[in-house]
Regions:
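Core of compact, soluble alpha-helical bundle domains
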Residues: 1-139
């Protein structure tokens, strides 16, 4: 049995964020949103999202931003589809399951699901997603 660390430190959360978004950049359904549509600067995005998840999960201050407003602006250009929300959550959960385990890992997975469901309802141009998370293969 191999030991997987929990997502209990900013360093581990940063590693999760980088690992996840490398996968996003290679995903046929998500890459067009992040790479083509949003033109994400990955190093800035990794830093911002590391601060976001450290704030959400560990209570560490430092995140400043308005994610719903930014995502809503993107969705006005090309509306987000429900399968994109499902893929984002499935890939996020799969990334966590492949490298981390423990109460913080499970908590972040639950919070990611809630955030994605909320975004799908709060962004006017997005398709509302039913919250069903597809099975992904752990790699």
């Amino acid at each position: 049995m191999s030991y997987l660390p929990d997502l209990s430190t900013p360093e581990e959360i940063g590693r999760l964020v980088r690992t996840f978004y490398v996968r996003v950049a290679e995903d046929d359904l998500l890459a067009p949103v992040f790479v083509d549509q949003a033109g994400v600067d990955w190093s800035t995005h990794w830093e911002t999202l590391t601060k976001f998840w450290c704030n959400v999960e560990l209570g560490i201050p430092g995140f400043v931003g308005a994610p719903t407003r930014k995502h809503a602006a993107l969705s006005e250009e090309v509306p987000f589809r429900s399968e994109q929300f499902a893929r984002w959550v499935g890939l996020f959960h799969d990334t966590i399951d492949s490298g981390w385990s423990g109460p913080h890992a499970e908590s972040i997975k639950a919070k990611a699901l809630i955030i994605a469901q909320s975004q799908s309802r709060m962004i006017p141009t997005a398709e509302t997603w039913d919250g069903e998370v597809p099975a992904m293969s752990v790699s």
